[in-house]
Amino acid sequence: MERITVTLGERSYPISIASGLFSQEAAFWPLRSGEQAMLVTNETLAKLYLAPVQRTLERAGVRVGQVILPDGEQFKSLSVLERVFSALLENNHGRDTTLVALGGGVIGDLIGFAAACYQRGVRFIQVPTTLLAQVDSSVGGKTAVNHPLGKNMIGAFYQPASVTIDIDCLQTLPLRELASGLAEVIKYGIIMDADFFRWLETQMDALLRLEPSALVYCIRRCCELKAQVVAEDEREQGRRALLNLGHTFGHAIEAEMGYGNWLHGEAVAAGTMMAARVACRLGYLQPQQAERMSALLTRAGLPVQGPAGMIPDAYLPHMLRDKKVLGGTLRLVLPTAIGSAEVFAGVSHDVVRDAIADCLA
């Protein structure tokens, strides 16, 4: 088993990565015999993993309830959050309960926010089942639900007690969802680690074949990089903003197209190339480096162009609601080379429009 620690003083927590963790009682630390937990998942995953995880927890002596939610980004909402609160209250869960988020980014974000709010804060465990959640959203304490006017606009920073990553989940992941997760994987190479980017260029086929050794290394490296950034900048006042490469454009795509029509990673991939084209237009990034980014995203099965029919002017209203906007000024994460990125403020809207146009189908 690989184990990484997110170092945040008394709120530090472990990330465990291995095959077969769902059958191991110790993988769901810090739950102990006699404690109460609410296991939350979606309708799709319930058929695959709810029973084995519940059996493992019950074998450990944990009293387990369950909530099964509808599957999809459109259900990451306040109304679904209320369903979780109702289930907790109706089943007499107190401040000593633990929420177990068994699912991808939607379940993890929503249940993390539920944990932050319920009785002013209860413990929760992230059990990510998609590559995207395993390498990104389950680590770092960002929790939220969506609003019709913007993605992740209602949320909190609230760290899990632990993260349990069983790579066997990826065997049942649709290829499109796997590719979506690879967008976040590639992002780490672009913004932080040129050696990892080069490794991805040589190992992409192995990842797409779900070779266990490649998956474990990939997930571990991403979690190491994320843990390092979160330890330095938990609340996104500085360096952590770099993890949002492609997200300002990507969130605009998701909001405009309707949540769930473009997967998050697909929107981030197209947004990453839009950010790269902005950087090229401003002279911060060499065009051949942008082409390497585009080539790797394409090999992963990801789009490098925006949605057909979404004109450049449709992006800006959404982008100006981005959480990185300060004083009405657009701030963008732009790659400056493979392995490095910076936040730039005051980028001309005309340059942004032109870069988006460069990436239209």
Curated annotation (Swiss-Prot):
GO terms for cellular component: cytoplasm. It comes from the Bacteria. Zn(2+) binds at E184, H247, H264. GO terms for biological process: amino acid biosynthetic process; aromatic amino acid family biosynthetic process; chorismate biosynthetic process. GO terms for molecular function: 3-dehydroquinate synthase activity; metal ion binding; nucleotide binding. Binds 1 divalent metal cation per subunit. Can use either Co(2+) or Zn(2+). NAD(+) binds at residues 71-76, 105-109, 129-130, 142, 151, 169-172. Pathway: Metabolic intermediate biosynthesis; chorismate biosynthesis; chorismate from D-erythrose 4-phosphate and phosphoenolpyruvate: step 2/7. Its EC number is 4.2.3.4. Keywords: Amino-acid biosynthesis, Aromatic amino acid biosynthesis, Cobalt, Cytoplasm, Lyase, Metal-binding, NAD, Nucleotide-binding, Zinc. Its cofactor is Co(2+); Zn(2+); NAD(+). It is found in: Cytoplasm. CDD domains: DHQS. Gene3D superfamilies: 3.40.50.1970, Dehydroquinate synthase-like - alpha domain. It catalyses: 7-phospho-2-dehydro-3-deoxy-D-arabino-heptonate = 3-dehydroquinate + phosphate. InterPro entries: Dehydroquinate_synthase, DHQ_synth_AroB, DHQ_synth_fam, DHQS/DOIS_N, DHQS_C. Pfam families: DHQ_synthase, DHQS_C. Belongs to the sugar phosphate cyclases superfamily. Dehydroquinate synthase family. HAMAP family: DHQ_synthase. NCBIfam families: aroB. This is 3-dehydroquinate synthase. It comes from Edwardsiella ictaluri (strain 93-146). The gene is aroB.
